[in-house]
Curated annotation (Swiss-Prot):
The gene is atpD. Transmembrane segments: none annotated. PROSITE patterns: ATPASE_ALPHA_BETA (PS00152). Belongs to the ATPase alpha/beta chains family. NCBIfam families: atpD. One of its GO terms (cellular component) is proton-transporting ATP synthase complex. The lineage of its organism: Bacteria, Pseudomonadati, Pseudomonadota, Alphaproteobacteria, Hyphomicrobiales. Its EC number is 7.1.2.2. Keywords: ATP synthesis, ATP-binding, Cell inner membrane, Cell membrane, CF(1), Hydrogen ion transport, Ion transport, Membrane, Nucleotide-binding, Translocase, Transport. This is ATP synthase subunit beta. It comes from the Bacteria. It is a peripheral membrane protein. Its main location: membrane. ATP binds at residues 155-162.
């Protein structure tokens, strides 16, 4: 506040929930500039959204506007919201305006970066199609992730979204030495707290941050005003962009991308915009596009984004999820019916898709094996009604063989996770892509027809399955 003399000073003229109008006598602050005011001893940041004329601007509050009064002094910072970036953010939790909220001391970084950035220019972008190997068999084989791509993660409550996210953070750190950024957008505070502690327990982060931490956390929870929820994804993305520009392969998680849209629609009406379909903001596609276009691979590094997507009332044609789909390169669908069988990760091998599963990208062998695996599983699915009514004995020999192979494939798609070691007691496995292809190729070609089903459950490579079969035979 001491610098007020050199900056434009305005006064609050109107407060309507998350939207605050401010009048300036001199020069008006630019759109997206951050304004600061003191709200009962707390720093409140307002972001300029509109110029109303009559020397007035309309702003969105990044925190609760309760306690603000008309005539209160507001200072223009002269720049957009800027947040700390760099290695010091790893293992820490910060809010939308870059303040630490984990009670682990101040966040001192050498650099700060504005949360509104342009997407990288075409000349800076890498157009080479590359796979990001995750070490998770079902993902790498059937719905591979593109390096610098966007992946949609669909799944209900309790099917293992969080565990899958944590395993990806762990594997990317191990296999690629990369960092991860997790943006909690409008999720439950309890879940955010659980994730923070689980990351410390599973070794992904160290308590209080510092050396050995692999993930930075940025939270704007359900109880925050819509301004914070609409901007927290951009704060997380800004932290990720800094790591990318240092040559890192970064994993960027957004949970949940729907809440980003929802927060935008909440402030849209208050800003006086006419709503579009289903009451969403008219700028829905623009808001989404501006954020998604920043997530990309450049010639220096990459940001690969995994976005949990909530589908309102399971309606995939709702404008919010439908707008997200246009940006996705791959989808990972978690299925409750697979989780009920005890197969984890509970990824649906027939519902999950990827545009990287193309012989020109993954190679002929990988493509053929993946398609054979899917057709075997599809056949098993088609025969399940017959099996339920008449039993296995009524099937032809050919169908019996297909069912036996499909059941082995189903079990071989499971694998023990590093982050779940604490609960399961079995050590985690990171499986190389060559081993994954080799194992499934042998399975679909009938090389392992003599091994029992149980040998394929919760193992890494096919060699481990063969070893397990020997132990089972000896027992």
């Amino acid at each position: 506040m001491a610098e007020a003399a050199t900056r434009s000073v305005g006064k609050v003229t109107q407060v309507i929930g998350a939207v605050v109008d401010v009048a300036f006598e001199g020069e008006l602050p630019a759109i997206l500039n951050a304004l600061e005011t003191d709200n009962n001893g707390n720093r409140l940041v307002l972001e300029v959204a509109q110029h109303l004329g009559e020397n007035e601007v309309r702003t969105i509050a990044m925190d609760s506007s309760e306690g603000l009064v008309r005539g209160q002094q507001v200072i223009d910072t002269g720049a957009p919201i800027s947040v700390p970036v760099g290695d010091e953010t790893l293992g820490r939790i910060m809010n939308v305006i870059g303040e630490p909220v984990d009670e682990a001391g101040p966040l001192n970084t050498a650099h700060k970066r504005a949360i509104h950035q342009d997407a990288p220019a075409y000349v800076e972008q890498s157009t080479e199609a590359q796979i990001l190997v995750t070490g998770i068999k079902v993902v790498d084989l059937l719905a591979p992730y593109a390096r610098g791509g966007k992946i949609g993660l669909f799944g209900g409550a309790g099917v293992g979204k969080t565990v899958l996210i944590m395993e990806l953070i762990n594997n990317v750190a191990k296999a690629h030495g990369g960092y991860s950024v997790f943006a909690g957008v409008g999720e439950r505070t309890r879940e955010g707290n659980d994730l923070y502690h689980e990351m410390i327990e599973s070794g992904v982060n160290k308590h209080g941050g510092g050396e050995g931490s692999k993930a930075a956390l940025v939270y704007g929870q359900m109880n925050e005003p819509p301004g914070a929820r609409a901007r927290v994804a951009l704060t997380g993305l800004t932290v990720a962009e800094h790591f990318r520009d240092q040559g890192q392969d970064v994993l960027f998680f957004v949970d949940n991308i729907f809440r980003f849209t929802q927060a935008g629609s909440e402030v849209s009406a208050l800003l006086g915009r006419i709503p579009s379909a289903v009451g969403y903001q008219p700028t829905l596609a623009t808001d989404m596009g501006q954020m998604q276009e920043r997530i990309t691979t450049t010639t220096t590094g990459s940001i690969t984004s995994v976005q949990a997507i909530y589908v309102p009332a399971d309606d995939l044609t709702d404008p919010a999820p439908a707008t997200s789909f246009a940006h996705l390169d791959a989808t990972t669908v978690l299925s409750r019916s697979i989780a009920e069988k005890g197969i984890y990760p509970a990824v649906d091998p027939l519902d999950s898709t990827s545009r990287m599963l193309d012989p020109m990208v993954v190679g002929e062998e990988h493509y053929e094996v993946a398609r054979k695996v899917q057709s075997t599983l599809q056949r098993y699915k088609a025969l399940q009604d017959i099996i339920a009514i008449l039993g296995m004995d009524e099937l032809s020999e050919e169908d019996k063989l297909a069912v036996a192979r499909a059941r082995k494939i189903e079990r071989f798609l499971s694998q023990p996770f590093f982050v779940a070691e604490v609960f399961t007691g079995s050590p985690g496995k990171l499986v190389a892509l060559e081993d994954t292809i080799k194992g499934f190729k042998g399975l679909v070609n009938g090389e392992y027809d003599n091994l029992p089903e149980a040998a394929f459950y919760m193992v890494g490579s096919i060699d481990e399955a063969i070893e397990k079969a020997k132990k089972l035979a000896a027992a």
